[in-house]
Curated annotation (Swiss-Prot):
Principal localisation: cytoplasm
A single Gene Ontology CC term: cytoplasm
Keyword Aminoacyl-tRNA synthetase listed: no
Entry keyword set: Cytoplasm, Phosphate transport, Transport
Protein name as it appears in the record: Phosphate-specific transport system accessory protein PhoU homolog
Function, in words: Plays a role in the regulation of phosphate uptake.
Subunit composition and interactions: Homodimer.
Gene Ontology terms describing biological process: intracellular phosphate ion homeostasis; negative regulation of phosphate metabolic process; negative regulation of phosphate transmembrane transport; phosphate ion transport
Annotated InterPro entries: P_transport_PhoU, PhoU-like_sf, PhoU_dom
NCBIfam families: phoU_full
Keyword set includes Cytoplasm: yes
UniProt cross-references to Gene3D superfamilies, sorted A to Z: Phosphate transport system protein phou homolog 2, domain 2
């Protein structure tokens, strides 16, 4: 099992420093992406086109951070040829930056919708749903990054588990908004913008789950991607929760 002390166990202090540096760069990128999501949701709800424009301007900075971290990972792989937990750390970082960059892309899409709605000048139906789901997704991103910083597989598991709640609430909100558009066709254009913003939030939740799965891989050494939640819980907690899955008991199927 890996923890923060694992980053300082190498004979080469330079290798220790390189691992800690690339990890800190990932977390710095994560902090900027987290702020980008916060600002995008706030800009949409409060009709703040200036804040939305700031979110869009940060996107290139996020892209550059992704490129820089990729280069660091390649350099470490080439020079140090890491193995075991060190290799898992580099793999987890190199994959997590992809999800962070895509979270930034989704935040930028929300910001674009915010600017569009500001130009139309009327608050559409659906802001309650945006605020509610937005708060939950922001918490998921924060917890996924905290789990990475603390090498906390249990916290990472809770993020993966919560993604199902986001998916369920997104579908509920979508049904309500479609019904509203059918009742008031004049609202279609504006409400569609809110629906696309909600879709971006749901995708951000998916990317937060991806990062949490990488944390579990990093800490436990088990690739839990594409696992159902029962089996993933068993891997993290070391229990036999997956027995029902293996036996294929009716009514015990587990959605991802």
């Amino acid at each position: 099992m890996i923890n923060k002390e694992s980053l300082t166990h190498h004979i080469s202090q330079q290798f220790n420093a390189e691992l800690e540096e690339v990890r800190s760069h990932l977390l710095a990128m994560g902090g900027l992406v987290e702020k980008q999501v916060n600002d995008a949701v706030t800009a949409l709800i409060e009709a703040d086109s200036g804040l939305a424009q700031q979110v869009r301007e940060v996107d290139e900075q996020i892209n550059q951070m992704e490129r820089n971290i990729d280069e660091e990972c390649v350099r470490i792989l080439a020079r140090r040829q890491p193995a075991a937990s060190d290799l898992r750390l580099i793999i987890s970082i190199s994959k997590s930056v992809i999800d962070l960059e895509r979270i930034g892309d989704e935040a930028t899409k929300i910001a674009r919708r915010a600017i569009q709605l500001c130009e139309e000048g009327e608050s559409p139906r659906g802001y309650v749903e945006v605020r509610h789901i937005g708060d939950q997704v922001r918490n998921m991103v924060r917890d996924a990054l905290d789990a990475f910083a603390r090498f906390d597989a249990d916290l990472a598991l809770s993020v993966a588990q919560y993604d199902k709640t986001i998916d369920r609430e997104y579908k509920t909100a979508l049904r309500e908004l479609v019904t509203y558009m059918m009742e008031d066709p004049r609202s279609i254009s504006r409400v569609l913008s809110v629906i696309w913003a909600l879709r971006s939030l749901e995708r951000i939740g998916d990317h937060a789950r991806n990062i949490s799965e990488l944390v579990i891989y990093l800490v436990r050494g088990t690739d839990v991607r594409h696992m159902g939640l029962k089996r993933m819980t068993a891997e993290v907690q070391g229990t036999a929760v997956a027995d029902a899955e293996k036996a294929n008991v009716p009514g015990e199927s587990d959605d991802k």
